[in-house]
Amino acid sequence: MVTDNSNSQNFYSEIEKWNDMSPKDGTREFGWAVYYSVIYYANAIIANKDNIKEGSQEDIDQLVGEAYLLRGYMHFILANLYGQPYTKEGAPETKSIPIKWDLDLEVVLPRNTVKEVYTAILSDIESARGLMHQKEWEAVYAYRFSTLSVDAMESRVRLYMGNWKEAYDAAERIFCLLYTSPSPRDCS
């Protein structure tokens, strides 16, 4: 069945236009709340990692690593939808989005700077890297993060930061993990 998806981008175009007063059909009220809801669940896994009793320690580490990567990814999306772009000159002072690290739903968080948000995202990426071990998933679990996802996200974040060498290095790690055939690249 073919459907008309012409309105699928309305949500993002309304954010871009800052059209809060007369939203069109398909525009979500408080669209940012969806992302913070996902962050809440990721924080719940991270905060309760010592209480997880099912599965091996390797499985638990993988799950917690995925929660860190998911939290970083949600902050990254929020920063790019609702914050200013990363610039080396403006990042330390320019306000972006609030970083959510815990489960407290009552606290009203102040906005963090662009630099603080990107530092938090990179911290979550490194936390995920230290815990995750699954290089690839079988098709039924293809929606889950893997070690390749960690490097892919790092590469994307570093590209947005203008750190070209670090972005290239992260992308190169993906290449080296995926392809074991001889290559002009040094994957050692």
Model-found features: residue ranges?
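TPR/TPR-like (Sel1-like) alpha-helical repeat modules
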Residues: 172-176
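Single conserved hydrophobic/aromatic residue that forms the stacking wall/gate
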Residues: 179-188
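Short coil/linker segments at helix-helix boundaries
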Residues: 82-115, 119
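Conserved, well-structured interaction surfaces
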Residues: 8-82, 112, 130-132, 137
